[in-house]
Amino acid sequence: MTSSPDITVSVQVHHLPAQSTPQRQLFAYFITIENNTDDSWKLLSRHWTITSGDGQQFTVEGEGVVGEQPLLAPGAQYTYNSFVTVDALPGRMEGHYVMGDAWGQTAQVPIPPFRLDIAPESGERLLN
């Protein structure tokens, strides 16, 4: 794997109280991936570590995101959303994407850690 290319990942998270219970809190998260390089990069896979407020931790890995493996041309953005539940607050998510270029090189692109809470940190989190 090569060093991380100049690909920016931004995250917004929203608590969904109407679909939550005291034992299981539901959150929607919105991810935007921006390719700031001069090359095209394809999102090959994802790796998430999700930690509940009680310390329970689990990992989610798989190909692409939401059933897609988007190809990001130079300057392009890709946005998707998904959902996660945690049993105890506050929770936390973090991880990385594995991206591939046209020459077969792969690179890990970090996903900034974000908090899962009823009153989440305000604003958008950015990571280069």
From Swiss-Prot:
<dbReference type="InterPro" id="IPR023065">
    <property type="entry name" value="Uncharacterised_ApaG"/>
</dbReference>
<dbReference type="InterPro" id="IPR007474">
    <property type="entry name" value="ApaG_domain"/>
</dbReference>
<dbReference type="InterPro" id="IPR036767">
    <property type="entry name" value="ApaG_sf"/>
</dbReference>
<dbReference type="GO" id="GO:0070987">
    <property type="term" value="P:error-free translesion synthesis"/>
</dbReference>
<protein>
    <recommendedName>
        <fullName>Protein ApaG</fullName>
    </recommendedName>
</protein>
<feature type="domain" description="ApaG">
    <location>
        <begin position="1"/>
        <end position="123"/>
    </location>
</feature>
<dbReference type="Pfam" id="PF04379">
    <property type="entry name" value="DUF525"/>
</dbReference>
